[in-house]
């Protein structure tokens, strides 16, 4: 098993030089490795508060920072959970605490719990998770605007795929973001729609691993 772990580490290092993520995933699955990151223990502990599958939380962290605790985005988001300064402060992180893995994940779970409450009228839990993910990426206000447009134009405001995601994309058109039902203005939704898809894609990958 020690040799297997060393080989896996070598593959991960080589990934920067062109080894595909699919190859790594197949390798992990073949050897039944028991974790997806060095932060699994923290993720499993904190996500109990949320009641989600820990692998969904791990998928969020992967998409946010690739498990790089020092990650900094071009917009200034930092840490594993990629908090912007104002959001970090709102959820109890001061200064460089955002770079502390345990504190960042704990605050990330608190934010996700806040978002779940914002979308608690969506009865289906799996569907609600998509709205929470979109809210994490875009902010809940823009998602609420998309829900309002969906309802106004005859789509289901509680369904993401093919409904609210479509109206989130429409928020870059003045006809829609200036609609009286919208409160948060212009928004480019492509990244958020892709983000939701990518988190679920990574989650489905993680659920195929043998733990």
Name what the model sees in each region:
Residues 2-10:
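Bacterial N-terminal signal peptides
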């Amino acid at each position: 098993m020690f040799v297997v772990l060393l080989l896996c580490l070598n593959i991960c290092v080589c990934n920067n030089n062109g080894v595909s993520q699919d190859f790594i995933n197949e390798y992990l699955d073949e050897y039944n490795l028991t974790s997806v990151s060095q932060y699994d223990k923290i993720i499993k502990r904190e996500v109990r508060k949320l009641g989600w599958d820990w692998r969904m939380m791990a998928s969020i962290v992967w998409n946010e920072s690739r498990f790089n605790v020092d990650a900094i985005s071009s917009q200034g988001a930092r840490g594993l959970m990629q908090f912007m300064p104002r959001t970090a402060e709102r959820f109890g992180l001061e200064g460089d605490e955002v770079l502390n893995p345990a504190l960042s994940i704990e605050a990330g779970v608190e934010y996700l719990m806040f978002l779940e409450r914002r979308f608690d009228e969506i009865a289906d839990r799996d569907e609600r998770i998509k709205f929470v993910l979109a809210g994490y990426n875009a902010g809940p206000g823009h998602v609420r605007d998309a829900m309002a447009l969906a309802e106004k134009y005859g789509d289901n405001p509680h369904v993401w795929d093919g409904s609210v995601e479509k109206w989130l994309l429409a928020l870059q058109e003045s006809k829609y973001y200036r609609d009286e039902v919208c409160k948060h203005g212009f928004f480019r939704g492509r990244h958020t729609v892709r983000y939701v898809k990518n988190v679920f894609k990574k989650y489905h990958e993680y659920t195929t691993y043998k733990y």
